[in-house]
Amino acid sequence: MFSDTHFHFKMMTEDRGVDGLKVLSTMAKRNCRFGLDIGTSADDLAERQACVERTIAGVDDAQLAEKIGNFMYFSAGIWPDVEAIHNCDQEMKTLRKSIEAAEFDSDQNTLHRRVIAIGECGIDHHWNPSGADGRCESDFDAATYRGERQLFEAQLELAREKNLPVIVHSRDGFEDTMDCIKNVGYDRGIIHCYSYGIDEARAFLDRGWYIAFGGAITYNKKAKLEAVKDLLRFVPEDRFLCETDAPYLAPVPLRGTVNTPVNVEHVYNFASEARGSSPEELSGTVDENIKKLFAL
């Protein structure tokens, strides 16, 4: 089973009705090596861990349950929504508290409770008023723009303090993202669900970042297909990662459905074909990159 460096298990199961027991069991049966459940709110870590723990408790096969516990990991971070931006100081205090509570949790037997990454966090200037996040350009006055950068930079600083990689969300905001990274001077982590071109990829890679591709790479029509394949070939083997961002961005042929980590195989199939390798070879490459990045 192919590793998935970015998904939202609680959103997928409790908000979208996915059978989490079936998903985790399938991942375990296919010998998944790594799955990273991603945080988006300062205080969501404990709830997300509890959601996974409840699901594991429902697995009848003890060996299967142990496998799930061995491949599941967690990040903690604050996605740049407007409310969080305007309450940066309190949000950061809450995030730190939740991370440190996990660090000192004594129950290490059934789940990796220690956070292995900060995020997702970053910059989002994709205006989508009718979408789930109701993101409006009118909400982003000068103070909000500054606050968004402040919130991102604070999490980069926290990651440096904790010696953890960062899961970066960057959409329609390359310049601001790069400015924040340069301001802090911390270059360890993933540019998740990568959506820019080769020039931007080069800028991230030159600073040491990994780049993760999701189901969106399978969406492009013929006019843009070669550019996407060129990008997939451009990213070097030792910086390449694959993800789903489940429950979002289900890959073709499942586009429009609720995504799950099981579907990451379609990302590997598409990316490996573009790169001239096999899905199995790419899977091995990604697993080695995961071990290196997260020091596993």
Model-derived features with residue positions:
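Mid-domain alpha/beta scaffold segments of enzyme catalytic cores
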Residues: 1-296
